[in-house]
Amino acid sequence: MKRLIPFVISMLAVPLIGGDLHGKVAAHGVRNSADAVVYVDRIAGKTFAAPSEHAKIDQKNMQFVPRVVPVVVGTTVDFLNSDALLHNVFSPDACADRFNLGTWPQGQTKTFTFKKECFASLLCKVHPEMDGFVAVLPTPYFAVTSADGSYHIKDVPDGTYTVKVWHPKLKATQKSVTVAGATEANFEIAK
């Protein structure tokens, strides 16, 4: 019995790991199913602190890389310029405080902290063909789809949630999903 008590106490100290939410998003009206953000909208009674580690978006070959980045509200994003020319990052969106980081050369990084839930567009005043997006979300349970539409969100607590899908060019969708262990949820989105 004396050996059992420490074991039981140690098991209580181990955090419970949730299930995995996975599936595919079929995106109609675009070249492929990449760049959709699949996320658990809210978990009743829980709020999530932003991670101390910054998210990173590079400006490389005159593109934002990655093009779509989901983060939790309060996350700071580092914007690196890897190109041998000047770049600028700004967002015209009010939810992102219409920030403008100015212009900077290769090898330098500027940062911005996203304080409100939103889908913020990223643009470059020097190169108007560049665009990117930051999805600022209420939970850390999110994924960006690959070109075939597949996604995988790890460690989602068991429960029933509204799972939403957002894409830069398509109409958002949502549905109720009950996560219990490994759970599959598929979506379709279109213009």
Model-predicted regions and their roles:
Residues 18-191:
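Extracytoplasmic copper-binding redox domains, predominantly the cupredoxin/blue-copper superfamily
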Residues 1-4:
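Positively charged n-region of N-terminal signal peptides that target proteins for export
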Residues 6-15:
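Bacterial N-terminal signal peptides
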